Regions:
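Short catalytic micro-motifs in class I SAM-dependent methyltransferases
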Residues: 92-96
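Residues that form or flank phosphate/diphosphate-binding pockets in enzymes
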Residues: 55, 98, 129
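Conserved N-terminal segment of class I S-adenosyl-L-methionine
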Residues: 1-78, 83, 87-91, 101-104, ...
Length: 227
């Protein structure tokens, strides 16, 4: 029972202070823009969704059979017809795909003409296998993902700024020092440090006025399929 409470506390810390996907204005704005067609009855797809459901009209896809998802499938071989969806999105999942270029081409294949693809990718983020962790993308790299899939890149911007990037670096570094001294304390230390340094994330908006993408936490972009 004690272990169960610790897992619950750890999950709360992770979701509240670490693994957040929609807690920035840029992410909220991009999602609201892309998800508008779903309000008029069109279908959408969320690739690598985990148990996150950004909208009730989105079909969720993931490789993990243990999750509460709609479809178990590989992002590189989506089991859907061409032009089946008005909207496709993938948030902080492509870094776990061995061939993200093929995965984005597949997302483009199942997208309607004039449909939109939203991609959110991490930049400054520690190694986090799920089950593996292969890639990090710059803003230019994200544009390249859209272009190689034959999509028109509408926009790419910072999803989480330099404050989040610094938060992640300090948390990982501090937890690593603690682990070197006493290995079992790594996860508790990481949770405490995530809370302690959380105010750094509040600097994202202020730093966005400067050339802060060198240590941005991540990027978000929207691509459109030609009509």
């Amino acid at each position: 029972m004690e272990r169960g409470r610790e897992r619950g506390l750890g999950q709360w810390v992770s979701r509240t202070f670490w693994s957040t996907f929609r807690n920035s204005r840029q992410v909220e704005r991009a999602l609201n823009r892309v998800l508008k067609p779903l309000a008029v009855g069109q279908r959408g797809l969320n690739v690598g969704a985990g148990e996150r459901r950004a909208h009730q009209a989105l079909i969720t896809v993931d490789l993990d059979r243990s999750l509460a998802i709609d479809c178990v499938a590989d992002a590189k071989r989506l089991p859907f017809q061409d032009r089946a969806f008005a909207v496709v999105l993938s948030q902080e999942a492509l870094e776990h795909v061995p061939d993200p270029f093929q995965a984005v081409r597949e997302m483009g294949r199942v997208l309607n003409r004039s449909g939109r693809l939203l991609l959110q990718v991490p930049f400054v983020l520690g190694y986090h296998p799920d089950p593996e962790d292969f890639w990090r993308f710059t803003a230019a790299g994200l544009r390249g993902l859209f272009e190689q899939a034959g999509l028109q890149c509408e926009q790419v911007e910072v999803a989480y700024g330099a404050g989040t990037g610094l938060h992640r670096i300090l948390v990982e570094f501090g937890a690593g020092v603690v682990e070197r001294l006493f290995a079992p304390a790594y996860r508790p230390a990481k949770g405490c440090l995530a809370i302690m340094f959380y105010p750094l994330k509040w600097l994202d908006g202020w730093l966005a006025k400067r050339d802060s993408n060198r240590i941005a936490g991540g990027f978000i972009g929207i691509g459109t399929k030609p009509a």
